[in-house]
Amino acid sequence: MKWGDARRSDNVEDVRGAGGGGFGLRHLGFGGTIAVLGIGWLLGINPLQMLGLMSALDSGAPVPQQGHAPPGNDAQADFVRAIVGETEDVWSALLPAQGVPYSPPTLVLFSGRVQSGCGGASAAMGPFYCPNDQRVYLDMGFFDEMRAQLGGGGDFANAYVIAHEVGHHVQNLLGIEDRVTQARRAGQRMQGGEGLSVRLELQADCFAGVWAYTRSSGITGWKRATWSRR
């Protein structure tokens, strides 16, 4: 995956080294589970292998979570800025065409623990989006764990995770998050294979696919032919 020439986003905040240490439980959150399954499907990885990865990540083993300050020349942060910039370019072109202005989220890089608009969180949760402050939170250690368990994921797999979380921001801008919240309060089923939680995550995967397609094939023709068919 070539990303070196991509525009770097200014909407990345690096607070690594500012969080507290301690120990957490190794647990892959629900959104992270769907994102990892989506990556496996795209890369042609056996679903049983993916389930093995999630079982390992969800083992409940204590994992040390120490905050470390980033190096001065941080290639990982540069990669994240490039991918966030790509998602900004894609969605700032697609959403206004549907009458929805696009305001990009801020992606927060943290290590160990972080305080979000949705409350305190640790790296054990995996990457997540908080609609209250419209921010994506990412501990880069998630990529290391995913790479170690999969035997290699690469830049595309990492970028897909970021695009998936940005997909939740797109849902928020489209009012989908609010509609799901209203449905939950009305007693609609959230859990299970047909539940709204799974559907919400699968749609975020779909939006990540929009990014993946347009970064390689361009926006113009696909935007008119496909995005409008909702």
Predicted regions and their residues:
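A Zn2+-metalloprotease active-site environment signal
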Residues: 6-21, 25-230
